[in-house]
Amino acid sequence: MKIVVYSKPNCPWCVKVKELMNRLHLSYDEKILDVDYTRDELRELVGEHLPLTVPQVFINDRRIGGYEEFADWCDNHGYGNE
C-alpha cells in the first residue's frame, strides 16, 4: 500500500494525521508545500471544486481526504484509529 501525505509546515492537522499513521505503523511518504509541491499542483490532484486544505492523504493514488476522512478510512479498513 502506497500512502502519500501532502502537508505544510506548522499545520496541526498534518501533525495529527502523521501521528495517527505512526501509531498504526503505516508507512507513508510526505510531500511538503513549497518544497515538494506547489498549491497549483495540489489543486490539480484534489480537483478545482474542492477547498484546498492540508493534509491531503492519497492511498494507491486515490484521494482519501484530510484527517477525518483518513481516520474514517482506517476504521472502515480494519486499522482502527486508537
Task: Enumerate the language-model features and the residues they cover.
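Short alpha-helical
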Residues: 12, 37, 65
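Non-catalytic, surface beta->alpha helical segment in thiol-disulfide oxidoreductase systems
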Residues: 59-82
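Local sequence-structure signature of Cys/Sec-based thiol-disulfide redox active-site neighborhoods
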Residues: 1-31
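Structural micro-motif
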Residues: 47-58, 67-68
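Thioredoxin-like thiol-disulfide oxidoreductase module
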Residues: 33-51
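Alpha-helical elements of the RecA-like P-loop NTPase motor core of helicases
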Residues: 15, 40, 72
